[in-house]
């Protein structure tokens, strides 16, 4: 599991997640979320194009990021969803919550 945070422009941050996002890897993501939230970004793009699998704990971490950023007045966009992660987002109707 790899997490990469990069600044796209002033106030815009991209979080790229690669591999599998499950109960084992979520603690690492939560650390990145804490660091990212501390900067109070106006927009967070979550790049899931290299995410192969997500379980309920992974979805919970993504929703947690969404709530934190929205609570600070920011926007969260999910890009690159495909395969199993896309099916999970649709099943949970998160495609209605996130701009995908």
Positions of the model-derived regions?
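Amphipathic alpha-helical interaction surfaces in cytosolic regulatory modules
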Residues: 20-97
